[in-house]
């Protein structure tokens, strides 16, 4: 089934599966084709994390950048009250910490 033929709910399930696998290429393709869906990249999953939080936990800088490009809010707190920056710092993901801080510095919205 092509992505064009998938329903919005099917795309969201495929998105969640690609996120769990860290499949950046598949996620990029899905995000580009979600325009007709009411899909919120900032929605919280059953674990109380957004896709961005989960990508930071996994230490996947490429996926973090992709999600931010498609509107992931770096300021959102997870169920424990931690932002993506908090999670990155706690997890020792220095590359993600640097990216988030640099992005905030040159963005109109702060972390």
Curated annotation (Swiss-Prot):
Transmembrane segments: none annotated. Pfam families: Ank_2. Belongs to the NRARP family. GO terms for biological process: blood vessel endothelial cell proliferation involved in sprouting angiogenesis; branching involved in blood vessel morphogenesis; Notch signaling pathway; protein targeting to chloroplast; regulation of cell-cell adhesion; sprouting angiogenesis. InterPro entries: Ankyrin_rpt, Ankyrin_rpt-contain_sf, PP1_Regulatory_Subunit. ANK repeats lie at residues 47-76, 80-109. This is Notch-regulated ankyrin repeat-containing protein B. Keywords: ANK repeat, Developmental protein, Notch signaling pathway, Repeat, Transcription, Transcription regulation. It comes from the Eukaryota.
């Amino acid at each position: 089934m092509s992505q064009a033929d998938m329903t919005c709910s099917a795309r969201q399930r495929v998105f969640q599966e690609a996120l769990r696998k860290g499949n950046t290429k598949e996620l990029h393709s899905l995000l580009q084709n979600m325009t007709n869906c009411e899909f919120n990249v900032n929605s919280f999953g059953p674990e109380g994390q957004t896709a961005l939080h989960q990508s930071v936990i996994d230490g996947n800088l490429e996926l973090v950048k992709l999600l931010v490009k498609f509107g992931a809010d770096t300021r959102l707190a997870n169920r424990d009250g931690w932002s993506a920056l908090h999670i990155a710092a706690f997890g020792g993901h220095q590359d993600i910490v640097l990216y988030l801080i640099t992005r905030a510095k040159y963005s109109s919205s702060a972390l």
